[in-house]
């Protein structure tokens, strides 16, 4: 008689995976979590101190960056990417991350690999000050090839209703501050994999695949600190679509546009390398973060103090542009 295991689903390996994963998830639990992993659902109570609490949610994945991780069997950092992609998005509206859920899919489950993936997720949650309260691991033979994995995440945060950041107060003359990225982050990898045929080629003394698997930076701690001290009018997480698609998302009014000075900071070597290998500059700004992973909009008279505060927190940040009256979209000059 045919069994589930013979059909390609190993329940025992699933149990072993859960046992390994639980140890990492435990390290992320806050005082607000009401139950541990293993229940049908995760439960968390809302923190006190919010007058009109609003829940802010986001979901994302890591895209084809995972293809490099799968080829090089290096899975312990892409979980950080997954968390970063979600929490940086909800952060744009002023939300403090509360909890996170993950979803892992594969063709054949290997407990050590799923454990490495969740190890990264847990590390990302700790960096984001949120709890990993649940998830799902799906073994799907026939849907995925053996050795292939995918990961997605779901983040929920909280913000007071009157502190939601939605760009409504942004005006002409406001300045834009860019916080440095850690590298390519998690977007543009379908293009990258076409450009870099040999993942083992040297890049500044290490294999290019090592550079490409550098985890996406999580901006939660420095940005939440800024929100307590300054009037941050708008924020943008520079992800898929680069500058052209993401920066206008912080604007809620028509009649405003964004001007970026591309010479205001040094573009990292990895992006210069991509341009050397044939990717046009406009395509670069339309695909990648170009060294700036997160952008803040502030009043002109707060620029210097915001930059000082970010420097104190160990972040590289630059005044990269301004809000312009008239026009639309983004002008990079």
From Swiss-Prot:
GO CC aspect terms: cytosol
Disulfides per UniProt: none
Lineage: Bacteria, Bacillati, Bacillota, Clostridia, Eubacteriales
Cellular compartments annotated: Cytoplasm
EC identifiers of the protein: 6.3.3.1
Keyword Cytoplasm: yes
Organism name: Clostridium perfringens (strain 13 / Type A)
Protein name as it appears in the record: Phosphoribosylformylglycinamidine cyclo-ligase
InterPro entries: PurM-like_C_dom (IPR010918), PurM-like_C_sf (IPR036676), PurM-like_N (IPR016188), PurM-like_N_sf (IPR036921), PurM_cligase (IPR004733)
């Amino acid at each position: 008689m045919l069994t589930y295991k013979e059909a390609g689903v190993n329940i025992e390996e699933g149990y072993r995976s859960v046992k390994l994963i639980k140890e990492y998830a435990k390290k992320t639990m806050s005082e607000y979590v009401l139950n541990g992993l293993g229940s049908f659902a995760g439960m968390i109570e809302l923190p006190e101190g919010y007058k009109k609490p609003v829940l802010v949610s986001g979901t994302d994945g890591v895209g084809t960056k995972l293809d490099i991780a799968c080829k090089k069997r290096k899975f312990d950092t892409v979980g950080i990417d997954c968390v970063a992609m979600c929490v940086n998005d909800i952060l744009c509206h002023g939300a403090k991350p509360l909890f996170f859920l993950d979803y892992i899919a594969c063709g054949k489950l290997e407990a050590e690999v799923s454990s490495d993936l969740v190890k990264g997720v847990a590390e990302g949650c700790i960096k984001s000050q949120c709890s990993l309260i649940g998830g799902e691991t799906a073994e799907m033979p026939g849907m995925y090839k053996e050795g292939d994995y995918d990961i997605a995440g779901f983040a929920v945060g909280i913000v007071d209703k009157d502190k939601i950041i939605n760009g409504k107060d942004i005006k002409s003359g406001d300045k834009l501050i860019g916080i440095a990225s850690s590298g390519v982050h998690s977007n543009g990898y379908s293009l990258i994999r076409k450009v870099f045929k040999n993942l083992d080629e040297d890049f500044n003394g290490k294999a290019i695949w090592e550079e490409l698997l550098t985890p996406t930076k999580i901006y939660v701690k420095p940005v939440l600190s800024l929100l307590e001290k300054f009037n941050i009018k708008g924020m943008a997480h520079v992800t898929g679509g680069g500058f052209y698609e993401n920066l206008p998302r912080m604007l809620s009014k028509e009649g405003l546009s964004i001007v970026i000075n591309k010479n205001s900071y040094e573009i990292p070597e990895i992006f210069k390398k991509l341009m050397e290998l044939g990717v046009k500059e406009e395509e670069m700004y339309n695909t990648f973060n170009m060294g700036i992973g997160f952008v803040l909009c502030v009043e002109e008279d707060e620029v210097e103090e915001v930059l000082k505060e970010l420097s104190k927190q160990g972040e590289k940040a630059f005044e990269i542009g301004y809000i312009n009256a008239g026009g639309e979209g983004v002008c990079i000059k």
